[in-house]
């Protein structure tokens, strides 16, 4: 079984560092599935669920990413995410409330800094909601 090293890092912390046999990353071109020895590429990440297949794990490791940059090398994948949250740390009610607050913040922003912050919070909330929807639709 071929493996690759995967690093998922947000501006606040390292979210995942370890091996994987497969990873799915939400990119601006669509979901990108990556196996070990993939051709080198770079892409922009869009809000959504990043999914990792990890050796020895029965379930996928899920991380909500709000955007960022993906770099793929034959033996290593790096995701530099604006905001990233492990699925175990997510709560639907909090994510929905954050989405509503961010939407209100966008409409009430008085300057570019406030608008950018509201967009960042909105992207993070959307990513969490998409990840929670993925979990719900794939429960067995």
UniProtKB/Swiss-Prot annotation:
Keywords: ATP synthesis, Cell inner membrane, Cell membrane, CF(1), Hydrogen ion transport, Ion transport, Membrane, Transport. It is found in: Cell inner membrane. It is a peripheral membrane protein. One of its GO terms (molecular function) is ATP binding. The keyword Transport applies. Its main location: membrane. InterPro entries: ATP_F1_dsu/esu_C_sf (IPR036794), ATP_synth_F1_dsu/esu (IPR001469), ATP_synth_F1_dsu/esu_N (IPR020546), ATP_synth_F1_esu_C (IPR020547), ATPsynth_dsu/esu_N (IPR036771). GO terms for cellular component: plasma membrane; proton-transporting ATP synthase complex. SUPFAM superfamilies: Epsilon subunit of F1F0-ATP synthase C-terminal domain, Epsilon subunit of F1F0-ATP synthase N-terminal domain. GO terms for biological process: proton motive force-driven ATP synthesis. Pfam families: ATP-synt_DE, ATP-synt_DE_N. NCBIfam families: ATP_synt_epsi (TIGR01216), PRK00571.1-4 (NF001847), PRK13442.1 (NF009977). F-type ATPases have 2 components, CF(1) - the catalytic core - and CF(0) - the membrane proton channel. CF(1) has five subunits: alpha(3), beta(3), gamma(1), delta(1), epsilon(1). CF(0) has three main subunits: a, b and c. Produces ATP from ADP in the presence of a proton gradient across the membrane. PANTHER family: ATP SYNTHASE DELTA/EPSILON CHAIN, ATP SYNTHASE EPSILON CHAIN, CHLOROPLASTIC. Belongs to the ATPase epsilon chain family. This is ATP synthase epsilon chain. The lineage of its organism: Bacteria, Pseudomonadati, Pseudomonadota, Betaproteobacteria, Neisseriales.
